[in-house]
């Protein structure tokens, strides 16, 4: 399992740990990832993703998973999240036609 957010592509960064005597040693800054189950309104089912806490805040700010994925570019999404975005778009495209009938 990679240490990368499935929604924002936030990953591991490298840098230096600097001691009191200014000796620099390499270190890794790991993203704060959590396993979360989102409810998709369009799909009508729960979706489990591994996301950063920053992404959780962004999803909440945009009004849910469906709204977040609608605005996100496919390039920054994981394959699983990109497939979800396509499925949600397909489902929403089919809704107006079903309502008009």
Curated annotation (Swiss-Prot):
Gene Ontology MF terms: structural constituent of ribosome
Q: Which SUPFAM superfamilies match?
A: L28p-like
Task: Output the superkingdom of the source species.
Answer: Bacteria
Q: Which InterPro entries match?
A: Ribosomal_bL28, Ribosomal_bL28/bL31-like_sf, Ribosomal_bL28_bact-type, Ribosomal_bL28_sf
- Cite the entry's keywords alphabetically: Ribonucleoprotein, Ribosomal protein
Q: Name one GO biological process term.
A: translation
GO CC annotation terms, alphabetical = cytosolic large ribosomal subunit
Q: Which Gene3D superfamilies match?
A: Ribosomal protein L28/L24
Where in the sequence is the signal peptide annotated?
Answer: none
Sequence similarity:
Belongs to the bacterial ribosomal protein bL28 family.
The record's PANTHER family line, in alphabetical order, gives: 39S RIBOSOMAL PROTEIN L28, MITOCHONDRIAL, LARGE RIBOSOMAL SUBUNIT PROTEIN BL28M
Which protein, by its recorded name, is this? Large ribosomal subunit protein bL28
